[in-house]
Amino acid sequence: MQEKYLVSVIIPVYNSSLYLQDILDDVKKQTYKKLEIIVIDDGSSDNSLEIARENERTDQRIQVYSFQNGGQSRARNIGLRIAKGQFIRFIDADDRVPADSIENMLSPVANSDSIDMVIGNFISNSPYGLYSGNELENTEISDRQFAQLLLKTPRAFYFGAPWNKLYRADIIRENHILFDEGIAWCEDLLFNLEYYQCCKKIHILNCKNGVYQYFVRDTGATGGIKNNKVEEARIEEIRYQKLLEYFEQYDLQEELKLGWKYINFYYRLTNCVKRETGGRSLRKRYKTFAEMLTPEDAYEYICLRENDYDPRVHKMLKKAMEKKQIHRMFLIFLFKSWMASHFTKTMTFIRKHAHLRIPTDY
C-alpha cells in the first residue's frame, strides 16, 4: 500500500508496565509505517513512563508526554490536540494489535474518500460473550443502515469502544468531538455517538485475525464507580439519553425503548444471582430470580438478549423456559456469573506471571 496518509496512534498509559512494551512493539512492527505514536502517561507510579521514554529514544515516531492523574479521557483528549495525522487510531496499553491492523483499516479509505469511518472485528479473551463483529461481512453501509445495525446491540463493545475504529481527524476537529472527562466509564460510547452523527458512510471490516485483541483485566478501574449505585444510575441515564438522541435522527427511538427494556431485564437477572448484589443467601437469590420470570413475556425478554451474544446459552435457556425449569435457568446464570468473575482474575494472574519458569529439578 502507498503510504500517503499519516496515522496518529494515541496510547493512554497508567501503571501498565506489565504490558506496555508488548503493545509498543506491536505498534512499531505495523506493516504500515507512516505513524505518529503518541503515548500519554497519566501519572503512573510504576515504571511505565521509563519504558515509554526508552522506546521514544529508539524510535523517532514515538512522542511521550506525562501528566498527573487526569484520567483516560483527559489523556485521549490531550492526544487528540497533539495529533497531526489525517486519521486517528486509539489503542489501550494493556491490549495487543495484529501487525497488519492499521494497513487493513486504511485499505477501504485509500480507495474511497467518501468513507468517514472504518470499524473492524476484534478478538477477546472475555468470558462474557462479547459481540465482536466476526460474523459481519466486509461492506460499506450508509448512516441509516449503520443505525439499524447498532440498534441490535447498543451496549456492545464493538460499537462503544474506540480501539477497533479508524477515525478521520478532520471530522473530530471540525465538530469539536472530545471524550467526556466528567464520567468514569461509558465515555467511549458517548464519543462514538457524536462521531457517528457526522458520518454518511461507514466501512465494516472483517479480518481473519481481527484488527485488535482485547484483554479483560482484573484492574478494578471502574469497580468503585459501578458499586456506587447513584453514580451508576446517573451514567446509565446519560447513556440512554444520548442513544435516544442518536436514534431519533432515524425515527428509531421506539425500537430503542423496547430494546432497552429487554437489556435491563437481562441485567437485573444477571445481578440478582450475584452474591455481592443479590444477597448472601443462595435461596434468597433463587427466589428473586424465580419471581422475575413469572411474567408471560419473560421468555421473550431473556431469549432475545442472549441470542445476540451467545447462541449456545440461548438454546439452553430456551429449552429451560419451554419446560418451565426455573432452577436450570438459575444455574445457567449462576455459572455464567461465576465463570466471568474467576476467569478475569485467572487470566490476569497468568499474564502477570507468564515470565516465571517452572522449576524442573524436583
How should these model regions be labeled?
Residues 209-218, 223-254, 265-267, 271, ...:
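Catalytic core of nucleotide-sugar-dependent glycosyltransferases
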Residues 275-362:
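Membrane-interface aromatic/basic loop that binds lipid-linked glycans or pyrophosphate carriers
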Residues 5-8, 36, 190:
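Cell-envelope/extracellular polymer assembly enzymes that use nucleotide-activated donors
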Residues 72, 93-231:
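Donor-binding/catalytic cores of nucleotide-activated saccharide
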Residues 66-83, 104:
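Glycine-rich, basic loop-to-helix element that forms the pyrophosphate-binding segment
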Residues 15-29:
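Short, well-formed alpha-helical segments that are part of the catalytic scaffolds
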Residues 41-50:
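A conserved acidic beta->alpha catalytic loop
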Residues 88:
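Short aromatic/hydrophobic "clamp" motif used to bind/position activated sugar donors
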